[in-house]
A protein has these predicted regions:
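Metal-dependent phosphoesterase/phosphodiesterase active-site architecture
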Residues: 1-63, 68-86, 134-135, 141-143, ...
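Catalytic-core regions built around general acid/base machinery
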Residues: 108-129, 321-344
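Short amphipathic alpha-helical segments
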Residues: 98-100, 147-149, 312-313, 360-363, ...
Length: 463
């Protein structure tokens, strides 16, 4: 949307670092790993478990109804049987405003909050989850809004209502302040603590020893903050990596493959990409692959590296995310050598495209070959359709093009007028026991068609 301002990547990184006191002396003294958390639910060592996935949810009511609330109510039917929820970003539209968290997040997902009284909704910056609600930021969670535009929207709202012109409810006087609202909701927001308060806080909440340092102890119902905008946790001997793709979703002029292959970063790299995060992911994937106690790996991020949705198939942000993630995976293969399995990662989960899609890459000639890609971005925002001309993703190969990924299943907007169908979705993923786990992916659909809502569970995918 043209009136929204996407801050520079360097600004996103700097502001988010300041909010979590990145690499502060108090962190170094205690050997704290600010990218690691441990879910303290007493069940994290069990090998068979289930979790939920949704994304692009916080849109609020639409002219025909409230799909976000419908999906949230359906989601609640699976909550008791699942250990945690992964949110793939765009938590609140259009620009992550604090003014919209009550209506577009807190109220729909009260079942996930310790305080569930509709008359006493908690403040957005004091939320406490009764089950792990693990998010990564999307582009809308970072957007800013020009002050003048916000005032114009507010001033014109009464006139639009009088003239019976649709009113944009997802635009208020404020934007996200470069992700500040998201950080206050989900992250361990440390910037405002005194040195004494910080010391006491770290002693109380960073208590889990891991091979990478002291980790944040995530306690459902007691302390439910994330240590950083990107992070890792281990559950059921599977490593989960949550990424902030909004800081590596823009093209750069250089080839990053040799950068990621090198042992150390150079000092003259372009600032419009998050090299630190990409190197972190590279190193953590290598360590995970070399750890005999880890039996699988799942990555989740906002921007889908592979997608056939009509508005995202050729989007620069998605193409950049693919290119940069590929650099990382190629570097991982180079470091692990002949021991590198195929695929390197068991599942890659994303959002951004307003649909559900399952794709599989072919032999791309890179570290992202033969991977399973699940796009889960149809949980509340306006749905989009599949590109009408293709069900594959192609790349230039010299003067020709070649297929690099094939869509296996697409669930999105269909038809028009009286024949229009709007299937909103979320996923339940059942992780089975075993040295090499299988994943039973169960898509749940709440469809609006012919002025009626229906619920269904699609056939499971065995991955």
């Amino acid at each position: 949307m043209g009136f929204l301002l996407d801050p520079p990547i360097s600004q996103k990184i700097q502001k988010m670092r300041s909010r979590v006191r990145w690499n502060a002396q108090a962190m170094r003294e205690r050997a704290i790993d600010q990218t690691r958390l441990q879910i303290a639910d007493g069940l994290a060592t069990t090998s068979a478990f289930s979790f939920l996935v949704m994304g692009d949810s916080g849109f609020g009511p639409q002219p025909f109804g409230h799909p976000q609330q419908v999906v949230a109510d359906y989601l609640a039917t699976q909550q008791a049987d699942c250990r945690f929820l992964l949110h793939t970003g765009d938590v609140v539209y259009q620009m992550g405003s604090p003014d919209l968290y009550a209506a577009n997040f807190i109220e729909p997902y009260q079942q996930w909050l310790v305080t569930g009284d509709r008359d006493q909704l908690p403040s957005y910056c004091r939320l406490l989850f009764n089950q792990p609600f693990l998010a990564v930021p999307g582009n809308h969670d970072y957007y800013n809004l020009p002050t003048l535009y916000g005032f114009l929207v507010a001033a014109l709202r009464p006139l639009r209502q009088y003239l019976n012109v649709p009113v944009t409810k997802n635009v208020t006087l404020r934007g996200s302040a470069t992700g500040d609202t998201y950080a206050r909701v989900f992250l361990d927001y440390l910037r405002e603590l005194s040195p004494e308060q910080l010391t006491a806080h770290l002693q109380q909440h960073y208590t889990t020893a891991t091979e990478t340092g002291q980790a944040l102890t995530y306690q459902p119902g007691s302390f439910t903050r994330l240590p950083n905008r990107y992070y890792q946790f281990r559950y059921g001997d599977i490593d989960f990596f949550g990424l902030d793709s909004s800081t590596f979703n823009r093209p750069v002029e250089i080839d990053g493959a040799p950068v990621l292959a090198a042992r150390e970063l150079g000092s003259d790299l372009p600032a419009n990409i998050d090299w630190t995060q990409l190197c972190w992911l590279r190193d953590r994937l290598v360590a995970s692959l070399q750890n005999p106690q880890v039996r699988g790996r799942i990555v989740y991020l906002h921007h889908p590296p592979y997608i056939t949705e009509v508005t995202k198939l050729h989007e620069t942000a998605c193409l950049s995310a693919r290119r940069h993630l590929r650099w990382v995976l190629d570097a991982v293969v180079q470091r692990v050598g002949n021991e590198a399995p195929t695929p390197l990662i068991d599942l890659v989960l994303s959002g951004h495209a307003h649909c559900f899609e399952y794709l599989r890459t072919v032999d791309t000639g890179h570290g992202d070959r033969e991977l399973n890609w699940l796009v889960c971005g149809g949980s509340g925002a306006r749905l989009r359709s599949q590109h009408p001309d293709t069900t594959t993703v192609e790349e230039a190969d010299g003067v020709d093009t070649r297929v690099v990924a094939k869509s296996q299943l697409f669930v999105g907007r269909q038809g028009a007028g009286a024949e229009k169908r709007l299937p909103y979705s979320f996923l339940r993923i059942d992780v089975q026991a075993g040295d090499r786990p299988q994943f039973v992916v169960r898509p749940f659909v709440a469809e609006y068609a012919q002025e009626t809502w229906t619920r269904s569970e699609l056939p499971s995918l065995m991955l």
